[in-house]
Amino acid sequence: MHTYKFIQIALLFASVALAIPTPPSPPNPPPVPQLPNSETKSNRLVSHSCEFCGVVKPSGPAYLEHYHQNHREEVWGKLATPSPPNPPPVPTQKVETHAPKTHGCEWCNKVEPSGPAYIKHYKENHEDQVWGKWAGQDAKASP
């Protein structure tokens, strides 16, 4: 029985996970062109030319830095623009980690600091308003 329930729950989670659409991913940056070194005949990278503007950079990191500074927004569009920074937090005089829960009476709008104090206030002042005078007499008369 437990195995059956486990399988049902697993299938439920799998179906929910498949139903969640994934956001579109931005396009990948262009690949770093690999140019062989003509002097040593090795495959070591010597220079990289930008396919957008033709600028030649000496290394892959320099090419990627050039790409991000100059052409990223052209390729990625609005996805490349950074979101505006969050406003700085407003300083407060006092930071409370715990605020006590108060209980307000819906009949007289008196606020009691705790649940037992509210129940005591309710029984003393408003029980007759809700149930009428007969509520207390019936409670005493019943065995």
Curated annotation (Swiss-Prot):
Region entry Disordered, spans: 24-43, 77-99
Composition bias type Pro residues, residue spans: 24-34, 82-91
Signal peptide feature range: 1-19
Zn finger residue spans: C2H2-type: 48-71, 103-126
MF annotations from Gene Ontology: zinc ion binding
GO cellular component, one term: extracellular region
Entry annotated with the keyword Repeat: yes
Cellular localisation: Secreted; Host nucleus
Record's keyword terms, sorted: Host nucleus, Metal-binding, Repeat, Secreted, Signal, Transcription, Transcription regulation, Virulence, Zinc, Zinc-finger
Induction info: Expressed during multiple stages of host plant infection, including the early biotrophy, late biotrophy and transition.
Superkingdom as given in the UniProt entry: Eukaryota
Function: Probable secreted effector that translocates into the nuclei of host cells to reprogram the expression of targeted genes by binding on effector binding elements in rice.
UniProt name for this protein: Host transcription reprogramming factor 8
Taxonomic placement: Eukaryota, Fungi, Dikarya, Ascomycota, Pezizomycotina
Gene it is expressed from: HTR8
